[in-house]
Amino acid sequence: MMLIRVLANLLILQLSYAQKSSELVIGGDECNINEHRSLVVLFNSSGALCGGTLINQEYVLTAAHCDMPNMQILLGVHSASVLNDDEQARDPEEKYFCLSSNNDTKWDKDIMLIRLNRPVNNSVHIAPLTLPSSPPRLGAICRIMGWGAITSPNETYPDASQCANINILRYSLCQAVYRGMPAQSRIVCAGILRGGKGSCKGDSGGPLICNAQLQGIVSAGGDPCAQPRVPVLYIRVFDYTDWIQSIIEGNRTVTCPP
């Protein structure tokens, strides 16, 4: 418990001095303390900050660009200043990346699977999230959450995790905003067309949850965040479920989808 308190104190510092290269939830509200049992926070003492999702007792899914030296992983956290009795701390044992020589890699290979150094115990505030059984539906209302900035471009960070609802949008809308996006990729385009809500700095690697399934991983967005008609790019988890399950089942040499 003392280790968790020390790590929580480091997290408070991260939320005060978070790097400006990650992503956050703008326009959200404080999450219900029981609605983000799968949400994890990744950070280190150098100022890196990301989210992630617990998908079983030993594995966390996040964005590849969230890789950092001396990574610490906290689970069961709601508030940086108020400790939950069931918070748990873990270190990464192994990290798996979806490497590719494809020129479009930056658009659809931003995924990292982390095996924890020891299994997590399910508790009141900790439980894994289900992987998707099908891709997200266009127009679906989905949930984002994290400890990312709540203002942009002058970032301020919350004490407690923030949640917001956004919509699955047409891929062509993101393609029109982000120059160089290919005609097709393993990206989910999501946000609010009028702006005002969205993932932002500090939320990278965190979940896009639709119908209680992990459909996306926060990858990239606009700057400033949550601008009208500037959606956020989420890695489409459904396309990687075979890769993820193969690694969990012990196949460490499995290749990513092309």
Curated annotation (Swiss-Prot):
GO cellular component: extracellular region; secretory granule
Top EC group: hydrolase
Disulfide bond sites: C31-C163, C50-C66, C98-C256, C142-C210, C174-C189, C200-C225
Keyword Signal appears in the UniProt entry: yes
Catalytic residue positions: H65 (charge relay system), D110 (charge relay system), S204 (charge relay system)
Regulation: Inhibited by EDTA, but not PMSF and beta-mercaptoethanole.
InterPro entries: Peptidase_S1_PA, Peptidase_S1_PA_chymotrypsin, Peptidase_S1A, Trypsin_dom, TRYPSIN_HIS, TRYPSIN_SER
CDD domains: Tryp_SPc
Residues glycosylated per entry: N103, N154, N251
Subunit comment: Monomer.
Residues spanning the signal sequence: 1-18
Keywords carried by this UniProt record: Blood coagulation cascade activating toxin, Disulfide bond, Fibrinogenolytic toxin, Glycoprotein, Hemostasis impairing toxin, Hydrolase, Protease, Secreted, Serine protease, Signal, Toxin, Zymogen
Chain segments annotated as transmembrane: none
Family classification: Belongs to the peptidase S1 family. Snake venom subfamily.
Annotated Peptidase S1 domain residues: 25-249
Cited Gene3D superfamilies: Trypsin-like serine proteases
Localisation per UniProt entry: Secreted
PANTHER family documented for this protein: KALLIKREIN-1 (PTHR24271:SF47), KALLIKREIN-RELATED (PTHR24271)
Pfam families: Trypsin
Entry's EC annotation: 3.4.21.-
Protein's name according to its UniProt entry: Thrombin-like enzyme chitribrisin
The keyword Protease appears for this protein: yes
PROSITE patterns: TRYPSIN_DOM (PS50240), TRYPSIN_HIS (PS00134), TRYPSIN_SER (PS00135)
Purpose of the protein: Thrombin-like snake venom serine protease that activates fibrinogen by releasing both fibrinopeptides A and B. Also has fibrinogenolytic activity, with a complete digestion of alpha chain (FGA) at 30 minutes and of beta chain (FGB) at 60 minutes.
